[in-house]
Amino acid sequence: MASLRKTHPLFKIMNDALIDLPAPSNISAWWNFGSLLLLCLMVQIITGLFLAMHYTSDISTAFSSVVHICRDVNYGWVIRNFHANGASFFFICIYLHIGRGLYYGSYLYKETWNIGVVLLLLVMMTAFVGYVLPWGQMSFWGATVITNLLSAVPYMGDTLVQWIWGGFSVDNATLTRFFAFHFLLPFTIIAATILHALFLHETGSNNPIGLNSDADKISFHPYFSYKDLLGFIILLTALMSLSLFSPNFLGDPENFTPANPLVTPPHIKPEWYFLFAYAILRSIPNKLGGVLALLFSILVLMVVPLLHLSKQQGLTFRPLSQILFWTLVADVMILTWIGGMPVEHPFIIIGQIASILYFSLFLILNPLAAWLENKLLNLNCSSSLATKAPVL
């Protein structure tokens, strides 16, 4: 008689996704980040739910309610610190997950990749509206600056901004709707995650050497379930260490001051995980141009599969493209640094050069390197055939 997990309609779905799923035998720890992101999402939803039980989305009490959570609610400070730092770990895992996809050519699974980009946009939107909720100085001014960017939309910009604000400035209506969005969007993220996994399981996972692995598959459980469990332990240990020893390390000191529309902070900046996009936005003097550059800094990922010219899937055996990949990693780090710096010389010009390089790597240099590698590969094959000794 067949096992219940293979026959029961509900258990069968879970079995096919988590237990008997055929996985390539050679996938490395870089393939752990999908499950780590799911763990991060669960941590954020659970901690967020408990925070929402005590938070009040009113400008007169929002800041005080966060203070109340940290001081008076049982383990409220732990929940709050886990939620705030959990967002940072979420983005660390996302960026590593995207980096893995770019390095090993996972973007060639177009449906999975495009849903992934949509997921990134949803998570960024959720994190942005969530950052506004404590109603500190940086929350208020961050919301004002970023929402104000929509005024760059031709014809309807000003109307659009006022519609989002619910008035003529960031006020009570803005905070209330941002809280509603912050509560709702994670459930949209769950739906998109299910689609992401569904499309992935249509094709199966890629592997480090980029070859077809149908001939060498192993079951997900116990091999990769235990491997993922190790990743969970490392991630949770790191999250707990940061949340308990240095909970405010990644935050902004300005957010310890209640929001004041009459006092502008000396330097308005978003959380560290948005700084690379913020640097690209600031590097263009024109407002509409900056907004478009900000949008395309994320949407450029959707173009990557269309610009894949190489005969190989990943970068494992492509030294030129590897150099460009690590240049991109360094470039994003430079942009992150520049995003946190004041708008003055030499940071302006460094940001502009780094922004040009960012788009050049995606749109020009990578396709060019792939084309050149194909030529070198053909040349090598031709020369090896020409020099091969005749068989007697």
Swiss-Prot record:
<dbReference type="GO" id="GO:0046872">
    <property type="term" value="F:metal ion binding"/>
</dbReference>
<keyword id="KW-0812">Transmembrane</keyword>
<dbReference type="GO" id="GO:0008121">
    <property type="term" value="F:ubiquinol-cytochrome-c reductase activity"/>
</dbReference>
<dbReference type="InterPro" id="IPR005798">
    <property type="entry name" value="Cyt_b/b6_C"/>
</dbReference>
<feature type="binding site">
    <location>
        <position position="201"/>
    </location>
    <ligand>
        <name>a ubiquinone</name>
    </ligand>
</feature>
<comment type="function">
    <text>Component of the ubiquinol-cytochrome c reductase complex (complex III or cytochrome b-c1 complex) that is part of the mitochondrial respiratory chain. The b-c1 complex mediates electron transfer from ubiquinol to cytochrome c. Contributes to the generation of a proton gradient across the mitochondrial membrane that is then used for ATP synthesis.</text>
</comment>
<dbReference type="InterPro" id="IPR027387">
    <property type="entry name" value="Cytb/b6-like_sf"/>
</dbReference>
<keyword id="KW-0496">Mitochondrion</keyword>
<feature type="transmembrane region" description="Helical">
    <location>
        <begin position="288"/>
        <end position="308"/>
    </location>
</feature>
<dbReference type="InterPro" id="IPR048259">
    <property type="entry name" value="Cytochrome_b_N_euk/bac"/>
</dbReference>
<keyword id="KW-1133">Transmembrane helix</keyword>
<feature type="binding site" description="axial binding residue">
    <location>
        <position position="196"/>
    </location>
    <ligand>
        <name>heme b b566</name>
    </ligand>
</feature>
<keyword id="KW-0472">Membrane</keyword>
<dbReference type="InterPro" id="IPR048260">
    <property type="entry name" value="Cytochrome_b_C_euk/bac"/>
</dbReference>
<dbReference type="InterPro" id="IPR030689">
    <property type="entry name" value="Cytochrome_b"/>
</dbReference>
<keyword id="KW-0408">Iron</keyword>
<protein>
    <recommendedName>
        <fullName>Cytochrome b</fullName>
    </recommendedName>
</protein>
<keyword id="KW-0999">Mitochondrion inner membrane</keyword>
<dbReference type="GO" id="GO:0045275">
    <property type="term" value="C:respiratory chain complex III"/>
</dbReference>
<keyword id="KW-0249">Electron transport</keyword>
<dbReference type="InterPro" id="IPR016174">
    <property type="entry name" value="Di-haem_cyt_TM"/>
</dbReference>
<feature type="binding site" description="axial binding residue">
    <location>
        <position position="97"/>
    </location>
    <ligand>
        <name>heme b b566</name>
    </ligand>
</feature>
<dbReference type="GO" id="GO:0005743">
    <property type="term" value="C:mitochondrial inner membrane"/>
</dbReference>
<feature type="transmembrane region" description="Helical">
    <location>
        <begin position="33"/>
        <end position="53"/>
    </location>
</feature>
<keyword id="KW-0830">Ubiquinone</keyword>
<feature type="binding site" description="axial binding residue">
    <location>
        <position position="182"/>
    </location>
    <ligand>
        <name>heme b b562</name>
    </ligand>
</feature>
<dbReference type="InterPro" id="IPR005797">
    <property type="entry name" value="Cyt_b/b6_N"/>
</dbReference>
<feature type="transmembrane region" description="Helical">
    <location>
        <begin position="178"/>
        <end position="198"/>
    </location>
</feature>
<feature type="transmembrane region" description="Helical">
    <location>
        <begin position="226"/>
        <end position="246"/>
    </location>
</feature>
<dbReference type="Pfam" id="PF00033">
    <property type="entry name" value="Cytochrome_B"/>
</dbReference>
<keyword id="KW-0813">Transport</keyword>
<keyword id="KW-0349">Heme</keyword>
<feature type="transmembrane region" description="Helical">
    <location>
        <begin position="77"/>
        <end position="98"/>
    </location>
</feature>
<feature type="transmembrane region" description="Helical">
    <location>
        <begin position="347"/>
        <end position="367"/>
    </location>
</feature>
<comment type="similarity">
    <text>Belongs to the cytochrome b family.</text>
</comment>
<dbReference type="GO" id="GO:0006122">
    <property type="term" value="P:mitochondrial electron transport, ubiquinol to cytochrome c"/>
</dbReference>
<feature type="binding site" description="axial binding residue">
    <location>
        <position position="83"/>
    </location>
    <ligand>
        <name>heme b b562</name>
    </ligand>
</feature>
<feature type="transmembrane region" description="Helical">
    <location>
        <begin position="113"/>
        <end position="133"/>
    </location>
</feature>
<feature type="transmembrane region" description="Helical">
    <location>
        <begin position="320"/>
        <end position="340"/>
    </location>
</feature>
<keyword id="KW-0679">Respiratory chain</keyword>
<keyword id="KW-0479">Metal-binding</keyword>
<comment type="subunit">
    <text>The cytochrome bc1 complex contains 3 respiratory subunits (MT-CYB, CYC1 and UQCRFS1), 2 core proteins (UQCRC1 and UQCRC2) and probably 6 low-molecular weight proteins.</text>
</comment>
